[in-house]
Amino acid sequence: MNILLSNDDGYHAEGIQTLATYLRKFANVVIVAPDRNRSAASSSLTLVEPLRPRQLDNRDYCINGTPADCVHLALNGFLSGRVDLVVSGINAGVNLGDDTLYSGTLAAALEGRHLGLPAIAVSLDGRQHYESAAKIVCDLIPKLHGQLLKSREILNINVPDLPYENLKGLKVCRLGHRSSAAEVIKQADPRGEAIYWIGPAGLPEDEAEGTDFHAVQQGYVSITPIQPDLTAHHSLRSLQTWLEQE
């Protein structure tokens, strides 16, 4: 199996390096990842400046672009040879509920799916037990690879920051929901000019049983199928009826 591995925390992040070590026990893995932290880059592509891949000593690559750039470049003529699966992660921090709208981790997987390949995104609820998340991915790939090939979806996997043996199991979940984000943080630079920082994410608001929030809080690995089709299908008929009214 040939796996393309990317992330949004950057090539040197512990999460992607740990995952690469585990995946290379049974697969051919090439990393194409950002050269720096590009968290919350979402699915943005770089269009106004060139992308500059830099090959590293172990034949992996880091790029001066976003996670989506990395996967797009890798699969659209940069890499030679077949790729069977795109894996993104391990992210330092969860991607639950509304986090998926901003996540570069999810975006790398979605770009792979958009370009016709099965894809998985994996995140850890912390910064300690990356090996637990890596083992979960290695457990799941043999089970799910065939099914993923038939699907237009990606899998969003979130792992509690616990030792592998303390994880309670796997749960297939829907996305939960966060409250609105906190206000931006206003400061002043050394010249007295106003600068702003994006504030913290909102707290979980819909964390009921059956959500990804609830599963991770209870010590389970959450698995949520994500589709790139953003159409609100349930609203099509009512919207058409509204437009036809005199």
Curated annotation (Swiss-Prot):
Annotated localization: Cytoplasm
GO molecular function, one term: 5'-nucleotidase activity
InterPro entries xrefs: SurE, SurE-like_Pase/nucleotidase, SurE-like_sf
SUPFAM superfamilies on file: SurE-like
Keyword Metal-binding: yes
Pfam family, one: SurE
Record's cofactor remark: Binds 1 divalent metal cation per subunit.
EC number in record: 3.1.3.5
Domain of life of the organism encoding this protein: Bacteria
GO cellular component: cytoplasm
Annotated residues for binding of a divalent metal cation: 8-9, 39, 91
Cofactor: a divalent metal cation
Catalyzed reactions: a ribonucleoside 5'-phosphate + H2O = a ribonucleoside + phosphate
Keywords, in A-Z order: Cytoplasm, Hydrolase, Metal-binding, Nucleotide-binding
Stated role: Nucleotidase that shows phosphatase activity on nucleoside 5'-monophosphates.
Family, per entry: Belongs to the SurE nucleotidase family.
Name of the protein in question: 5'-nucleotidase SurE
